[in-house]
Amino acid sequence: MKGLRSNFVHRHQSQMKKIIVTTVFLFQTVLLFAQAQIQTKVYKWGTGKTAMFDGAGAIFSKQVLKGHAIAGGKKLKFNTGVGGDELFFIIKYGPVHVELNGVSHHLDKGSVVFLLPGDDVVFQNKRKDDVEIYEMQMASAQPDLARGKAAGTSFVMDWFDMSFKPHDRGGVRQLFDRKIVMSPRFDIHITTLNPGLSSHPPHTHKTEEIILMIDGEGEMVLGTSKQKIITGDAAWVESNIPHNITNLAKRPAVYFAIQWN
């Protein structure tokens, strides 16, 4: 009888140890894959395995910005699958041949590609030197594929087809303001800011924002700090953080302003 009781206790203890080990492993896995909050700062352009930034915000549970250099004669293909991330691309240095869901496009610097989950896009470099693109990955805890598809299909926007509206500080190209799979609103415009001018006094707004400099040299107010931003760099701005940008160069600065909520 004592032997049976001893065996039972031993088996029970062994099972409890397995449960504890499994629980600890699962907890560590959750911590490993949890996305850290993206910090408000200027992130430098770079290519390779390391992303410019990789984390989460108030809306996106995952937001990653990567730089890709595509060598002459090479191509890159993207398809995250029906349940995968939503992707957004900007041509940093082109031109580059783009095939979106089987339709061909020839896109140069400043052009964009928006890719819904499950669709295909291929970037092909037909030049001898490298071309460069940004890739932004977006995921949400509450994705809505029907919402994204109802707003429209995956698309490209050619820089040379974008409408430019001049104003007293330079001008603006309003690309789109629409619903997407990962967010009820995704808004992008491109600002041209004349030399020596500021975009506006430092201000705040609830929406998070990315300022991505495709041509120029500026200084950004980000909360209590001032940080330099040059061609290729991107600033990620948290909700309600005072910010603005001043053009430090003797030529116009051109940058993307990307917001979502």
Task: Report each predicted region and the residues it spans.
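Conserved short histidine dyad/triad with adjacent acidic residue
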Residues: 63-82, 189-204
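N-terminal signal peptide c-region/cleavage motif recognized by signal peptidases
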Residues: 29-31
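Positively charged n-region of N-terminal signal peptides that target proteins for export
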Residues: 2, 16-19
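Ligand-binding loop in jelly-roll beta-barrel domains
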Residues: 118-142, 239-261
